[in-house]
Amino acid sequence: MDAELTNRSRDALNAATTRAVSAGNPDLTPAHLLLALLEGQDNENLVDLLAAVERRPGGGSARAPSASLGSLPGVTGSTVAPPQPNRDLLAVIADAGRRAKDLGDEFLSTEHLLIGIRPTARPPRCSPGRAPTPEKLLEAFQNTRGGRRVTTPRPEGQYKALEKFGTDFTAAARERKLDPVIGRDQEIRRVVQVLSRRTKNNPVLIGEPGVGKTAVVEGLAQRIVKGDVPESLKDKRLVSLDLGAMVAGAKYRGEFEERLKTVLSEIKESDGQIVTFIDELHTVVGAGAADSAMDAGNMLKPMLARGELRMVGATTLDEYRERIEKDPALERRFQQVLVAEPSVEDSIAILRGLKGRYEAHHKVQIADSALVAAATLSDRYITSRFLPDKAIDLVDEAASRLRMEIDSSPLEIDELQRSVDRLKMEELALDRETDPASRQRLEKLRRDLADRERSCAAHRPWEKEKQSLNRVGELKERLDELRGQAERAQQHGDFDTASKLLYGEIPTLERDLRWRPAEEEAAKDTMVKEEVGPDDIADVVGSWTGIPAGRLLEGETQKLLRMEAELGRRLIGQSEAVQAVSDAVRTRAGIADPDRPTGSFLFLGPTGVGKTELAKALADFLFDDERAMIRIDMSEYGEKHSVARLVGAPPGYVGYEEGGQLTEAVRRRPYSVVLLDEVEKAHPGVFDILLQVLDDGRLTDGQGRTVDFRNTILVLTSNLGSQYLVGSAPEEEKRRQVMEVVRSSFKPEFLNRLDDLVIFSALDEDELARIAGLQIAGLARRLADRRLSLDVTPEALAWLAKEGFDPAYGARPLRRLIQTAIGDRLAKEILAGEVRDGDTVRVDRVEDGLLVGRAEG
C-alpha cells in the first residue's frame, strides 16, 4: 500500500496516527484521517475542492470531526500498543484505491482519500443533503485536475498551476488595478508585431531599470481588454509567470521541473489563448538547475522555437548581455525590442496621466508645477537612475510626506491638548480642598485653563480643514471607482448601467470636487497644506542627494550674476582669478555643451595665495557645502602602477571590488568640485585619463561603469613657475615666464581642453591685512561657541599683517602667527581659569608683541 501512496497521502496517514496516539485512541479512524487531511500543511487543493462542492470555504468541514474525536474510546498506560487502522479506515483506503484505478491513476492521492472518507466520517447532526456526496466530490476533482492523471508522487502541486504561479494582467486591467500607460505606442506596436509572427513570436523588452518595460506589457494588457489589438491577440489572456514561486518550496528533486512542465502544458492546452510574460527574463537561465537538473531556459526552448508558447520577456541591458547572450540557442528564440529612456517632456506627460491615481491614493492635491519640477529636477540631479521611474518616485514620496504631515497632529496643538487635560485633573483635585491657599491656587488654575481652552478653540479649524480634505480624498476614490465600473459596464455591453454612471453619478461627483476647491480657495488662511508643490519635490530631491532644496529652485541666472561678489568675500587679492572663474562658469552655464564638465581650470601660483581656498569657495557657492569638494593629492599618483587607483584596479588585481578613488567619489556625489592638488607631481598617465574627462565629461571605471563628470567643476592646482611670480619683474613678463614653464611641462592636447589657465598673483601687505581680518573673524566665531567675545585693536591687526607678511609663502605664515600669538596664549589662560565663559578677550599691541587677556570693566 505504501508504494502506491503519494507523498502527501503518506504524510496525512502519519499525522493521523500521531493525532490518535496523542488522544490515547487505540484505533485509527476515518475521523483522524479527515482531520489530518484538512488541518495539515499544503492542503489548499482539498479546501478548494470542498469549497467548490459546498459553495463555501472548506474550513468549516475541518471542525466537524474534531468534535467527534472526544467520543472515541481512549486508553492510558506505558505499554499501550500503537493505534491500528480500524475496519472503516481500511474500507476507505480500499475504496480510494478502486477509484484511483478507475481513473487510470498510478498513485493514491489525498483527493482519492477524501472522496472515500467523506461518507463514513460524516459529523453527527449533519443532514445528508448538506454533506458532499462522493459523486459530487469526484466531479469537482475531475474538473480541478483538467483530465490529467496522477502519475507522480507529487501530483497535488500540479492542479491549477497557472493560477497558482501566475498573475493575470488582463484580469487586473479589467478591474482597473493597473496604472494607465501614457505613450510607449511604438514599443507596444512592435511587441504586437512580434507576437503576431508564426514562429519565434517572443519579444524581449530590453532597457535600463526604471524606463518602463513592465509598463509596456501592462499597456498591452489594457489594449487587449479594450479590443485595440489585431485579431490574432483579441480576447487573449496575458499571464505573468512567477519563477520565484515555482522554485520556492520545491523540496524534492524534479519538483520544480514538474511545476514548470504543468504550467507549460496548461498554456499549450489553451490553444494559443494565453500569452505569457516573464519579468527579469534572465532568471530563466539556471533557474531550478540544482543537482544536474534541467534549468527553466532549456525547458522553454522547444516550445519557443515551435511557436507553441508566446512569451514576452523583460530584462536590463546588462543582464541580457551577461545571461541571455551567453546562451545563443535561447537568444535566437527572442526578438529584441529596445525600450529607451523617455525625454523630460514625455516623462511630464506620463506623470500627468498618473496624477489622478496618486491623488486618490494619498488624498492630496498635486500641482502641475510639481510634476514639471519632478521631471526636471530628477533628470538634472539624480543621474544614477532613469526616467520616468525616478520622477514618479519623487511625486509619490512628496505626496506621502504631505499625507503624513496632515495625519499627524501639529506639535503645538498636541501639547496644548495635553496641558488642558492635565489642568482639568488638577482642578478636580483642588476643588475638594477648602483652605484659602488651595482656593487661591484653584482660581489661578481656572484662569490658566480658560486661556488654554481658548487657544485650543482657535486651533479647531485645523480639525475641520483636515476633515474637509479627507472628504475630498474619499470623493476622488469614489470617482475613480465609478469610472472603473462604467468602463467594465461598457466592455460587457451593459450600456444602461454605463449611461447612468457616465451621465448621472460621475458628473455629480465631478461638480462636488470642482466646488470644494473653489470654496477652499475663498478661505485663504488655511492651517493644513493640501497640495504638493515644487518646494515639496525639491525637499525630497534634497534629502536624496544632499543638495539644499532652496538652491534647486533658485534661477541659475540670479545665482551666477552675484558670483564675483560671493567669491570675493572669501578670496582676498585675487580679483582677476575670481573674474576669470566666474566668467567661465557663467559662459558654460549659458551655452553649455552637455558633454563636458561645468568648468575645468588650471590654477597656477605660489603657495598660500588662495588656490585651494577658491576651490572651497566654489563648492560652497555652487553647492552650499564646502564638503562638496573631492580633494585628491596628486603627489600620491607619481608612480605608474598607482595611476589605476584613480579609476579602480582591473579585473584579477587586488582591490578590483573597491572601485577607483576618483570615479567612486564622483559617482556618489556627481555635483561637486573635483580638486586635483599639485597636479605637476602626477605620473603622465594621469593626464591621459583626464583627457577623456575634459573632452567627453565621462570616465569608465575598472568595473566597466560609466561615471558622469558633466556636473562637476574640475580644478587642477600647480606651483609651476611660482618663483617668477614673487619677483620684481613686470606683470606681463611674469605671466609669460610662467606660461613657458607650463607649456614645457604639460602636453598641448591637455592644456587645449581646459576652459582657462588662471594665474594667481603674490599677495601684498594691504591684502594680507584684510586676510588677517578674515582670520580673526574665524577665531571669533570659534570663541563664540564658548560664550567668549574677542576684541582686537587696529594696532594689533596691523602688527599681525606686518609680522606675518612673506611674499614667498603667502598667507600661511599669517595663520601660524595668529595661532601662536593669540590662540595658544588664550588656551593657556582658559585652562588656568583666568578667562571664563562670558568674558571679553582683548588683544592689544605692546612693545614686544601682543598682549592677550581678559578685558577689564
Swiss-Prot record:
Disulfide cross-links = none
Region NBD1, annotated ranges: 160-341
Region (NBD2) residue spans: 556-762
Q: Does the keyword Amino-acid biosynthesis apply?
A: no
In terms of domain of life, where is this protein from?
Answer: Bacteria
Q: Which PANTHER family match?
A: ATP-DEPENDENT CLP PROTEASE, HEAT SHOCK PROTEIN 104
What is this protein's function?
Answer: Part of a stress-induced multi-chaperone system, it is involved in the recovery of the cell from heat-induced damage, in cooperation with DnaK, DnaJ and GrpE. Acts before DnaK, in the processing of protein aggregates. Protein binding stimulates the ATPase activity; ATP hydrolysis unfolds the denatured protein aggregates, which probably helps expose new hydrophobic binding sites on the surface of ClpB-bound aggregates, contributing to the solubilization and refolding of denatured protein aggregates by DnaK.
Q: What is known of its domains?
A: The Clp repeat (R) domain probably functions as a substrate-discriminating domain, recruiting aggregated proteins to the ClpB hexamer and/or stabilizing bound proteins. The NBD2 domain is responsible for oligomerization, whereas the NBD1 domain stabilizes the hexamer probably in an ATP-dependent manner. The movement of the coiled-coil domain is essential for ClpB ability to rescue proteins from an aggregated state, probably by pulling apart large aggregated proteins, which are bound between the coiled-coils motifs of adjacent ClpB subunits in the functional hexamer.
Please report the name of this protein according to its UniProt entry. Answer: Chaperone protein ClpB
Q: Which organism is it from?
A: Streptomyces albus G
State the gene name recorded for this protein. Answer: clpB
